[in-house]
C-alpha cells in the first residue's frame, strides 16, 4: 500500500469497524449526535494516524459533526500540498459506502489541516452535497 493510499484507507477501516455497532443507533438528528460522538471516540482510540507527511491528531464531535484535525509533520517533506491531500482524502471518504451511510444518517465531517510550516489552515466539510449523495 502506498503512502498516498493510506490516509483514507486507515480511516475507512476504522469507520467500517464501527458501522455494525452503530447502525442501529442513528434514526435521525437526535441520534445522529450520539452517532457522531461514538464515531469520534472510535477514531480517537486509534490516534495518531500518520500518512504522507500529515498526522491525524484529534477527532471530536460537535452536534452531528465529526471534527478531525490533521497537522503537517514539522521537518518532514510532504508528498502532497494540504489542498491536494484534502482533495484526495475527500474523494476516498466520499467513495466509501460506510461514510456514505453515516452521511445519510445525518453525520457530517469537518476536516482541518493545520500546516505547521506556514501557519495556514485548510478545511473541508463532507456532507450530502460535497459527497454527491442524493436524499432518498
Give the positions of each predicted feature.
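Bacterial N-terminal signal peptides that target proteins for export
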Residues: 2-12
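Short, intrinsically disordered, charge-biased short linear motifs at domain edges
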Residues: 10-15, 78-84, 115-121
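C-terminal motif of bacterial Sec signal peptides marking the signal peptidase cleavage site
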Residues: 21-24
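Bacterial signal peptide processing site
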Residues: 26-29
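Polar/charged, Gly/Pro-rich intrinsically disordered segments
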Residues: 33-77, 102-136
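Short, non-transmembrane amphipathic alpha-helical segments
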Residues: 78-102
